[in-house]
Structure formats: structure tokens, C-alpha cells
Amino acid sequence: MDSAPSGLTLTVIILSIILLAFISTVVSAYETAITSLTPYRWKNYIKTNNKQDKLSTKIINHFQNHYSSCLITILITNNIVAIMVSNILFLALEQTIKNELLSSVLNLVVSGVLIVSFCEILPKTLGRINVIRTLVLFAYLVYFFYLIFWPITKLTSLILKKYENPLPVSRKDVYYFIDEIEQNGLFSKEDSLLIKKTLIFDQVLVKKVMIKWKKVAYCYLNDSINLIAKQFLQRQFSRMPVVDKTTNKIVGFIHLKDFFTAKEANPKSLDLNQLLYPVVLVQDSTPIKQALRQMRLNRAHLAVVNDKHEKTIGIVSMEDIIEELVGEIYDEHDDIQPIQVLDENVWLVLPNVKAAYFFNKWIKPDLVKSKNITIQHYLASLDNDSFACQNKLDTPLFSVEVIADSEDKTKILYEIRKKSDVIA
């Protein structure tokens, strides 16, 4: 029967286990860190901290470019460490404890708790929390094992190379990423919505944002000056299409400023042809990004929209295109509507609008039972004190902020925002 290990042997065993446990801890943390590292985050760190020439930076760059080899190195190291710890403990316990069953159980429990809990679960959690710090701090040690196991990792990488095709980043991936940033509080709902709209900006077609021809205010080339002036004054548009009555084609646009300047200078012999701006033609199937570029190149604020049969079906302005990104734009000449849609989940609402009409249509069906109560009285009934003092109200379904009219402070509007997780 073997005698119990001597003090020196016991010291060597303990130190060996501590060293192996440390190695396992490092590579486990490194595995999570290298997996969690994103290229943009790493590049930002290098640029911000001026670490381009550091050896650790070059090592981490190499690991990113040879991710499979790095991961194989970590897995091999971890498995070897686990086997060595288990064998060392088995030999030590076998010499110390006479009962083989008890020795095996203690070996399993000690090595299992030590390796799984303290050398894998805990370091992996810390590696995910401190990604860059972990990578930089232990780059040299992991690279040491990378060199030791290079023949194995190289051979394995060559075998796996034909199966290793990195998946391209899709729009859906970017959407998930934006949603995650929004949930972490770095983006507001409006910011994330704007970015998402920017991503699909080149997919939106002109026919979605154009003004249909039946809603367009226009004049004929042979209309009287007074009639055209009346059109401008009534419609409050800065530009107007001019149509040739003979061909029924748009021959150009006139600008309000040019028209009234010429009218004042020479009202009797004003020639409309001299005021015309050339027509920019776009197809209804044209992406708005391309239409915007075409309008900018031609320095045109408006474009005529034709269908595939070259029939004029509407017009589109730069404002229409920009509103697709930022939401509805109202200027000082627009009439104040009872309900102004600023975005798909944001509205400006007058106090006298019926609460049932607005909330049941846009927030949630059957939210308001009474058909006669106004929004002003409905909101006041929800929370009198805080709403009256702070001019703000927050509910599980929506939030409200009181907006004073810029010209008349006694007039107010309610900015109502629907919560993103509410389904109408």
C-alpha cells in the first residue's frame, strides 16, 4: 500500500492544481471575450486609446482573423487542463484515502466544482462583462498556447475552412442591434425609428409618398394672371405646375415669388413662359432615394410622377420625401388640424377632439367608453394633480405632454405618444 504523500509532494500537487486552474480560468474568460468582441467596438478602442502599434493589439487582430484557430486552441487547452487536474487529484486522493469509492467521489466533486464553477462559469461571466480588458490582459498567455498547439489548430482549420463561410449581416440583424441599443437606453424610440427608416430609404418607392394628381393644385398656360394669383393665395403653395391645355401635359412649374414679382413689375404683359422652371420626370416605381438625387441634380423642388404608360399620375416634392424619414412636417402656413400625425406613434391633438375617436382608433379599441368626452376632460380625469402641475402624464398605453402654441400661449396641444409594445 502506498504511503500518504509527503509535505513537498503535497505542495507540488497544490501548486500544480492552482496553476492549471489559473490557465483554465484565463482561457475560459478569453473564449467568451473573443466571441463577444465586435469589430466596430475593437476598432473604436484601438483608435481612441492609440493602441495600433501594441503587440497585444496585433495578437488580438490575428485572433479575429483566425477565429477558428483561436477557439480550437482554447478548447484544447481547457480539455488538457481538466484531464490533468482530474488525474493529479486522483493520484493524490488514492494515496491518501484507502476507500476507492470515496476517493473517486471526492475526485469527481472537487474537480467538478473547481473546474466547472471557478474555472469556467465565473471567468466566462467576467469575460463577457470586461471584454476588451480580458483580451488585452491575457493576449500573450493565450498566444503562447496558440503557438504550442499550432500544428493541430492549423490542420483543423484547413479541414474546416471550406465550411467556414461567415454569414453576411442582414437588415434584420441591424434592426435587432438597434432594438437592443434602444432597450439599453442609448437611443430613444424616435432615434431608432429614424435609423430604421434610413436603412429602408432606398426601398421606398415614389408612389408611396407622391401627391395624387386629383389633389394637385395647378394652372393652365393660358389662364389669366388674376386667376393664377387667386390660386396661389387660396392654396398657399410656393410652387404650382403649369399645364398646356392643348396637350394636357405639364410644361413646367412657376414659383410664387417669381410670379408676384413679375406681376407687380409688369401686370399687363406678363409672359408665363418666361417664369417656367423645367419639369423633372420620375417614374412611380422609382425609389425615393434616386428621385431625391435626381431632383437635387436638377435643382428642382418638385418632380412630376408618371406611371409605366407615361401618364402623369401625381407630383412629389422634396418635403414629401424627407417626411418619409422624419415624419409629417407642418409649417406656419398650414392650417392646424385637430389631429396632426407626426409619426406612426406620435400625434399632436387639439383639446376638443373626442377622446373615444382618437384613443379607440389609434391607441387601443374600446379604451374610452364615453363618446362625448373630449381629450382634455378625459386626460384630466386620469390624473388631476400631476397632470395639472407637471403638464405631463404617463400611462401603460401612452404618454402625454402639453405643448403651448408658440404664438398664443393660452392655446395648447397634446403631444400623445403610443408605447411601442401596445398593439392597436
UniProtKB/Swiss-Prot annotation:
UniProt-listed InterPro entries: CBS_dom (IPR000644), CBS_dom_sf (IPR046342), CNNM (IPR002550), Ion_transp-like_CBS (IPR044751)
Record keyword Transmembrane present: yes
Pfam families in the record: CBS, CNNM
Domain CBS: 210-270, 272-332
Span of domain CNNM transmembrane: 6-191
SUPFAM superfamilies in the record: CBS-domain pair (SSF54631)
Topology of this chain in the membrane: Multi-pass membrane protein
Subcellular location: Cell membrane
Gene3D superfamilies cross-referenced by the UniProt entry: CBS-domain
Keyword field contains ATP-binding: no
PANTHER family: HEMOLYSIN-RELATED, UPF0053 PROTEIN SLL0260
Protein family according to the UniProt entry: Belongs to the UPF0053 family.
Protein name: UPF0053 protein MG146
Species annotation: Mycoplasma genitalium (strain ATCC 33530 / DSM 19775 / NCTC 10195 / G37) (Mycoplasmoides genitalium)
Lineage start: Bacteria, Bacillati, Mycoplasmatota, Mycoplasmoidales, Mycoplasmoidaceae
